[in-house]
Amino acid sequence: MKRAVVVFSGGQDSTTCLIQALHHYDDVHCITFDYGQRHRAEIDVARRLAGQLGASAHKVLDVGLLNELAISSLTRDNIPVPTQSEDGIPNTFVPGRNVLFLTLAAIYAYQVEAEAVITGVCETDFSGYPDCRDQFVQALNHAVCLGMARDIRFETPLMWLNKAETWALADYYGQLARVRHDTLTCYNGVQGDGCGHCAACHLRAHGLQQYLANPAAVMAALKRKSGLQ
């Protein structure tokens, strides 16, 4: 049986990854992390979506220690969330978040004998986070396999897709409306199209506009990149 673990926040990217994983794997587990994020409503959204989409299990882990160590606008209410993309590393970056999340997801994958950990990080159309880069994911994957003496593959299906192509991927599986209306990507914790002001909402909305303006061309680009038929 092919089994995978999806790092699942209930946002656009991880939900799209879960939808695709359910088509590629026989058994899909989700793992969600509660680190005291200001947009904690995403945890309830993740629980609901994991059940609706048919994940076989969903584990929510308390990693509040990350909140104590990592100072960010996503972990501190007194630090304002930026309304547009910043040069350099933005204040929404949570240091060590993906180091911790991917490592814990790999431990869970080890226990349930999953062959892959799937994460929705992306280098093409991203927010400037260093732990979303392909180089980082590959390096950590290598270290985890050495440390566990087991081959657990880190999969990043969105790594080289832009936001418009990520919308196309959801549409390819017939789930565009669900991803648009039922996920939570907004840094201010507003479901669906979000607050419309934060950097995450701007990126998401711009990608959707690009896709809806020319769906055939974007879908064709997605298929070329991903090998979908």
Curated annotation (Swiss-Prot):
Q: Name one GO biological process term.
A: queuosine biosynthetic process
For the keyword tRNA processing, the answer is no
* Reaction(s) this enzyme catalyzes, per UniProt: 7-carboxy-7-deazaguanine + NH4(+) + ATP = 7-cyano-7-deazaguanine + ADP + phosphate + H2O + H(+)
- Pathway where it operates: Purine metabolism; 7-cyano-7-deazaguanine biosynthesis
Q: How is the cofactor bound?
A: Binds 1 zinc ion per subunit.
State the HAMAP family in the record.
QueC
Q: Could you identify this protein by its name?
A: 7-cyano-7-deazaguanine synthase
State the organism named in the record.
Edwardsiella ictaluri (strain 93-146)
